[in-house]
C-alpha cells in the first residue's frame, strides 16, 4: 500500500493534481462495470511507470497536449481577473514575482520606485501584484522610506500565484499595468488590453535561456508592437534596437538609474585596516560568471596583483559556497541576503570590487559601488565597452583572463591612489535623483494612451 501511495505521489508531481484526479475518474468510469478478475495479468511495474497501471492497465499516462504546453512555462499563465467599473482615484498595478527580503536589490527596487513615482504624480492608487509569494508590505515601506517617496493613497497588495491555487483579483476597466519581466508581461497580456501595459525591461531577457521554447516565448514578448517599453539605461536600449527590435525604438524610451548620496556614499574607515575587495558572487545566476570570477581572483592572488596581506576578500550575493583562496590558505568572508541598509553600508566600506555581467546591461552593483566611492572592475560585452561616462572609477576588461588581470591590476592601483580615486568620485556622472531619472517616464503616464 505504501508503494502504491508513493507511486501516486510521483504521478502527481509529474502530471499535477488535476491530471491525476482526471486519470483516476476516467479509468474508473470506463471500467466500473467490468467483471472482477478480468484485468489482464501484468509483469511487475518498471520504476518509471505510474501506479495507475496497477489499477487501470497499461494504457495510462496520456495527457492533454494543450495542458502540457501550458504547464511547460507556468509563470506565463494568464492573470485571473474579473472586471469591475472604474473607480476614483484610478489605479496602477505593478506585476512582479516578489518584493520580499532578498528580492529588493536592483531591478525589483527600481520597479517599485518607478511605480510609486508614477502613482504619486498621477494621483493614482498603487497596487502590487506578486506571483511567487505573498507580498510583505515592509519591503515596499523600506524602499519608499529610503528614497523619501510619500504616497497619498494606501497601497494595495494582491497575490496571484502561479499554478493551480485558486484566486481571482479585480481589475478596473481603465487600470494601467507595469510589468517587470517577459513572463509577467505574457501573463498580463493574456488578461487585459495591450494598450494598458508598460513593460519595464532591465535586461535582454532572451539571454537568460538557451535557444528553445523559453527563448522563443521571451523573444515574442520583446517583439510585441502593441505595448510600451521603459528600458533601464541607454546602453540596453541601443542594444535591443540594434538586435532586431525596432518596436522598442518606436514604442519605448530609456532612463538612467539614480544613486542618491543619502544612500550610496563613502563611509568613514578605520585607519590601518586592510583594504576590502568585494566579489559579486551569485553561482546560480550564470550571467554573473561566478566560476570565471573565481579563476580570475586566484590568478590575481598568485601573480601578486592582490596581496592578501593588504586585502580582505568579501563575497556578497546568494548561495555562496564555502571558499578558500590561495591554495586553501585564505578563507573569504561570505555575506548573503543583506538588507538594503546593510548593502549600502558594505558598498561604502569597499575599496575595490569585481562585478561580472555577461550581458549588455552594466548591472547595478558596479553603479552602486562606484556611487559609494569604490573602484570597480567589470567586463565588456557587445556595446558595453566603456563605462567611464558614468564614473572613471569603473574599469572594463575583455572577457579573456589576461585582459581581466590587467583590469584588476589597474583597479588595485587606482583603489590605492587616494587622490585620483577621490577626484574620480567627485566627478561621477551617475544620477542622484530618482524623480529626475523618471521625469519623462512619468510624463508619458500623465499623457493620453
What does each model-found stretch correspond to?
Residues 107-110, 127, 237-340:
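Conserved catalytic-core segment of nucleotide-activated headgroup transferases in glycan assembly
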Residues 166-172, 212-230:
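Membrane-proximal helix-turn-helix segments that form the acceptor-binding/catalytic region
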Residues 357-358:
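Aromatic "clamp/platform" in nucleotide-sugar-dependent glycosyltransferases that forms part
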Residues 187-188, 208-209, 225-250:
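A short, active-site helix/loop in glycosyltransferases that binds the activated sugar's phosphate group
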Residues 375-379:
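Short hydrophobic beta-strand element within catalytic cores of glycosyltransferases
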Residues 399, 413-449:
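A charged, aromatic-enriched C-terminal amphipathic alpha-helix characteristic of glycosyltransferases
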Residues 71-74, 78-81, 206-213, 253-274:
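Acidic anion/phosphate-binding donor-loop and adjacent secondary structure
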Amino acid at each position: 500500500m505504501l508503494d502504491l501511495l508513493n507511486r501516486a505521489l510521483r504521478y502527481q508531481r509529474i502530471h499535477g493534481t488535476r491530471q491525476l484526479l482526471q486519470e483516476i475518474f476516467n479509468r474508473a468510469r470506463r471500467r466500473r462495470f467490468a467483471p472482477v478478475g478480468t484485468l489482464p495479468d501484468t509483469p511487475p511495474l518498471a520504476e518509471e511507470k505510474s501506479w495507475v497501471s496497477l489499477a487501470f492497465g497499461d494504457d495510462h499516462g496520456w495527457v492533454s497536449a494543450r495542458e502540457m504546453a501550458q504547464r511547460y512555462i507556468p509563470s506565463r499563465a494568464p492573470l485571473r481577473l474579473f472586471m469591475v467599473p472604474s473607480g476614483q482615484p484610478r489605479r496602477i498595478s505593478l506585476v512582479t514575482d516578489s518584493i520580499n527580503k532578498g528580492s529588493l536589490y536592483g531591478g525589483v527596487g527600481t520597479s517599485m520606485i518607478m511605480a510609486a513615482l508614477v502613482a504619486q504624480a498621477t494621483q493614482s492608487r498603487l497596487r502590487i501584484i506578486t506571483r511567487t509569494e505573498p507580498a510583505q508590505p515592509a519591503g515596499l515601506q523600506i524602499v519608499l522610506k529610503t528614497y523619501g517617496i510619500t504616497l497619498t493613497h494606501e497601497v494595495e497588495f494582491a497575490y496571484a500565484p502561479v499554478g493551480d491555487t485558486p484566486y481571482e483579483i479585480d481589475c478596473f476597466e481603465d487600470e494601467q499595468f507595469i510589468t517587470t519581466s517577459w513572463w509577467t508581461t505574457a501573463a498580463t497580456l493574456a488578461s487585459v488590453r495591450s494598450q494598458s501595459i508598460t513593460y519595464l525591461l532591465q535586461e535582454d531577457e532572451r539571454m537568460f535561456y538557451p535557444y528553445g521554447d523559453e527563448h522563443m516565448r521571451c523573444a515574442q514578448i520583446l517583439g510585441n508592437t502593441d505595448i510600451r517599453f521603459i528600458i533601464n539605461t541607454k546602453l540596453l536600449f541601443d542594444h535591443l534596437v540594434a538586435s532586431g527590435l525596432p518596436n522598442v525604438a518606436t514604442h519605448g524610451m530609456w532612463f538612467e538609474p539614480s544613486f542618491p548620496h543619502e544612500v550610496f556614499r563613502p563611509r568613514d574607515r578605520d585607519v590601518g585596516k586592510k583594504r576590502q575587495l568585494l566579489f559579486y558572487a551569485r553561482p546560480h545566476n550564470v550571467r554573473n560568471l561566478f566560476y570565471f570570477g573565481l579563476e580570475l581572483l586566484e590568478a590575481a592572488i598568485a601573480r601578486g596583483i592582490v596581496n592578501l596581506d593588504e586585502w580582505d576578500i568579501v563575497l556578497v550575493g546568494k548561495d555562496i559556497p564555502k571558499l578558500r583562496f590561495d591554495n586553501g590558505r585564505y578563507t573569504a568572508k561570505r555575506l548573503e541576503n543583506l538588507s538594503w541598509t546593510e548593502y549600502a553600508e558594505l558598498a561604502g566600506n569597499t575599496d575595490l570590487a569585481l562585478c561580472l555581467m555577461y550581458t549588455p546591461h552594466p548591472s547595478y552593483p558596479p553603479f552602486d559601488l562606484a556611487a559609494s566611492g569604490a573602484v570597480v572592475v567589470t567586463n565588456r560585452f557587445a556595446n558595453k565597452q566603456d563605462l567611464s561616462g558614468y564614473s572613471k572609477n569603473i574599469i572594463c576588461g575583455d572577457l579573456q583572463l589576461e585582459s581581466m588581470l590587467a583590469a584588476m591590476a589597474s583597479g588595485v592601483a587606482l583603489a590605492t591612489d587616494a587622490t585620483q580615486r577621490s577626484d574620480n568620485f567627485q566627478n561621477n556622472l551617475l544620477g542622484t535623483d530618482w524623480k529626475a531619472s523618471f521625469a519623462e517616464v512619468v510624463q508619458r503616464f500623465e499623457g493620453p494612451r
